[in-house]
Structures are given as C-alpha cells and as structure tokens.
Amino acid sequence: VREDRVLLRGGRLEDRLRDCIRELAAGPLTGGVPAVPERTTLKRAFLDPWGLAWLDFNRGLLGRRSPGDYEEWLAVASLVRTVCDNFPEIREIRIMVEGQVVVSLNGYIDLEEPLSSDDFPLMPVSGGF
C-alpha cells in the first residue's frame, strides 16, 4: 500500500536517501509490518552519471525472521519504488550489504542487475512475483 510522508528535501542526496530508508524501516503509519526489517539502515550511497544508485545497507536488511518469496518481493519492491519514485535523478538501484553486492536477500529475487520501478508494478503480477 502506498503511503505518503513529508520529508525535508534539502541537503546531500545520501542524507535524503538515508531519511527515506529510515522512514520505510519504521513501518506503516497505520500499523502493520514494515516492508524492510526495522534494523535496516543505509550506510552509504553513490549515484553514477547515468542515474544508477548504489545503495549499501547494513546487515539489518537481511534480518527477516520469516523469509519467503512475498516478503522478499515486498522488501525489494519497496526499496526500489521508494528510491526511484521519489528521486528523479535516480533511474535504477543496485543493492549492497556491508559493501558487497548481494545476489539475493533470501534466495527469491535476483539482485545481480540494476532494478527500476518498471521491474515492480504496484501490485504483484497474477500468478507470481
């Protein structure tokens, strides 16, 4: 479910990204389970000249207690859409954990290539993710 929040837009891109990820990890305002584990923090971010953002998270991103295909889809889709939809200068993202590119968070979604909002429609495609 899409949720709107107001964050200050000033400052460095890395700081603004960190604020967005912190809000995402805080969970929905209406209650419910956060899309990413609450201990998730963005350690570093780098934007290349072509609009690819490299996002380096702490191990908290891998800390899902009951990993499954939907939980992983929700986490990755939420990260991608939160970043790409709110930062026009970012077209795609790559997810890293502790400075290392990860193949997948829990074995379900391939993270070896850059991801964009086009990869994650607002609702899962019928019959799978």
Tell where the protein language model's regions lie, with residue ranges:
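Bimodal "functional hotspot" detector
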Residues: 1-129
